């Protein structure tokens, strides 16, 4: 073989090797799969230790590659988590009102406090001056979100309409989530008219709002901001200070629930944990907090690492 021919052979071989290497995709069996399996295992342990019934739904909002569903289609008492749907219908009607549709509730519509509207667990409304204090629907929504004021929630139910709330939910394909009564309606509760939801449908609702499938962008941002008001709740209890959580907890005898969007850095996720038949309310609250903590640790870590686990340099 001549020197020229040998050189040409080597060049061709090198080019072929490079081309072959460029055609091969990167391996997909990364450590993130193993990390997620560890999270699933720890959450399963939490669920097993809990003495009642627990339902869990977690979905990655970045690309949807990670999700965890445990008893997620089971129907639970929603408790005050149903107020998510009331808040959503209010914002939906506000969009309609601003577009000129008559008979829809707007966020800036006024309400004059009437003590006849008062029900139990109304921490703010019970201290207002009758026939003097005027509030907007936005104010009522803030009371409903921040301190779970039941009178504020009931006034908003009257204003947006229970049937409209359920119609909105049904239109989204959510058949297990229903507003069946006002807050503190003991007689209705005894009849079995419980406000209900499933973890999976609560997650679907929150995901649709986050992705702009229900409200327009500005309205969705306002809705999330209002729901992110700091309040006593279970999802953020063991998360680092400063993590934004747009959530609504709920509490009834034997029941604890919490559903929301957790804005972990670069990797937000949506979570709903619902419990029932709980002999120990504090244990139920702790179970929700423990599940949220495990989920957060995964998404927070994945938000700052490569697919293979290296913590990436900050910009």
Task: Annotate the PLM regions.
Residues 61-62, 104-125, 160-161, 226, ...:
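Acidic helix-start/capping segments at beta-turn-to-alpha-helix junctions
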Residues 23-49, 159-161, 204-234, 240, ...:
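Structured C-terminal helix/loop/strand segments within mature extracytoplasmic catalytic/sensor domains
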Residues 49-53, 71-73, 77-82, 106-108, ...:
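Extracytoplasmic
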Residues 53, 133, 153-206, 210-211:
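Mid-domain, small-residue-enriched loop/turn segments at the edges of structured enzyme/sensor domains
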Residues 38-71:
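A short, well-structured edge-of-sheet supersecondary motif
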Residues 116-154, 162:
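Conserved catalytic neighborhood of penicillin-recognizing serine enzymes
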Residues 64, 77-111, 271:
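Active-site SXXK
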Residues 5-16:
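Bacterial N-terminal signal peptides
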């Amino acid at each position: 073989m001549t020197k020229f021919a040998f050189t040409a052979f080597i060049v061709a071989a090198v080019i072929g090797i490079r081309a072959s290497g460029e055609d091969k995709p990167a391996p997909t069996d990364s450590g993130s799969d193993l990390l997620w399996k560890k999270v699933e295992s720890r959450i399963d342990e939490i669920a097993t230790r809990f003495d009642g019934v627990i339902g869990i739904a977690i979905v990655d909002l970045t690309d949807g590659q990670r999700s965890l569903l445990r008893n997620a289609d089971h129907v639970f008492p929603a408790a005050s988590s149903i107020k998510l749907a009331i808040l959503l219908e209010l914002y939906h009607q506000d969009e309609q009102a601003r577009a000129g549709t008559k008979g829809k509730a707007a966020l800036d519509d006024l309400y004059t406090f009437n003590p006849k509207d008062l029900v139990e667990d109304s921490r703010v409304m019970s201290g207002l001056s009758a026939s003097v204090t005027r509030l907007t629907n936005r104010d009522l929504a803030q009371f409903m979100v921040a301190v779970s004021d039941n009178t504020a929630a009931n006034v908003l139910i009257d204003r947006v309409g229970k049937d409209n709330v359920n119609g909105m939910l049904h239109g989204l394909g959510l058949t297990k989530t229903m507003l069946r009564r006002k807050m503190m309606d003991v007689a209705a509760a005894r009849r079995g008219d419980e406000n209900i939801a499933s973890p999976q449908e609560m997650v679907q609702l929150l995901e649709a709002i986050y992705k702009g499938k229900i409200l327009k962008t500005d309205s969705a941002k306002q809705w999330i901001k209002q729901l992110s008001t700091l309040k006593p709740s279970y999802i953020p209890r063991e998360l680092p200070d400063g993590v934004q959580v747009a959530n609504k907890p709920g509490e009834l005898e034997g029941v604890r629930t919490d559903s929301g969007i957790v804005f972990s850095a670069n990797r937000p996720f949506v979570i709903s944990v619902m419990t029932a038949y709980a002999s120990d309310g504090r244990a139920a609250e702790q179970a929700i907090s423990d599940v949220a903590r495990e989920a957060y640790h995964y998404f927070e870590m994945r938000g700052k690492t490569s697919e293979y686990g290296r913590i990436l340099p900050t910009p």
